[in-house]
């Protein structure tokens, strides 16, 4: 350890030669630690998986059923009431907290508008096997979308909520299924942008292993996109939704801001007229 005196520390330690090498090594070591630990750091703040598989009694209480179940695995949940959908099918990717079962509140308003809604479940959520991460979620989402199209045909739409917007955007870019439109609720622009606002002192591009770059993924999306933001979003400040919206192709986008709503309570502020406007736009 060097104790600073009036004359300063020896040049061999702090000088241009020795000190420069020392500081570079320290920064290099810090970068290595951040990069090697990046996946763990990212996953701790981004994913909250659980093994709470819905029971038969739970599903019956909400009039839901497993969709595309195979052994102990399943792709998602579906309402028993809207099998004969007149408006098409919506594949819905939920946020990073909770499970598909917790998103039953989507079924009634969208079902009333004639949509069949598949509440897609992620790997390692809701008792499903697999692992978390963008690569895993997007690959799983692509297969879920393919199967939905196989089962029900067109039109098929994607709806993303929070993290699910990033999944939906990536799926929309990579799929060969002809999508009719896209709905994004409380979205971000890029994961790096969100991480930078949360951790301004970290080199987030080195730490992050997932990208979820919705700006890049949607820049050539050919159909209409409805973007819905919450005015008082305390988790993903609404500026991220605005930044994404500004980047989207002109003439094929529309944005709604739900007054007084936060990131998690916005459903209480979304009435039937809002749902109709949002879905009517993507149906054009």
Go through each PLM region and give its residues.
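An N-terminal hydrophobic leader/cap segment in hydrolases
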Residues: 36-68, 75-77
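Membrane-embedded segments
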Residues: 74-147
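Short alpha-helix in the alpha/beta-hydrolase fold that links the catalytic acid
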Residues: 106, 214, 223, 237-246
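Gly/Ala-rich beta-loop-alpha elbow adjacent to hydrolase catalytic centers
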Residues: 160-164, 168
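Active-site nucleophile loop of the alpha/beta-hydrolase fold
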Residues: 183-193, 210-214
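Short beta-strand/loop motif that positions the catalytic acidic residue
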Residues: 221, 227-229, 233
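Acidic catalytic loop of the alpha/beta-hydrolase fold
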Residues: 232-236, 264-265
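C-terminal catalytic histidine-bearing segment of alpha/beta-hydrolase fold enzymes
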Residues: 242-243, 250-284
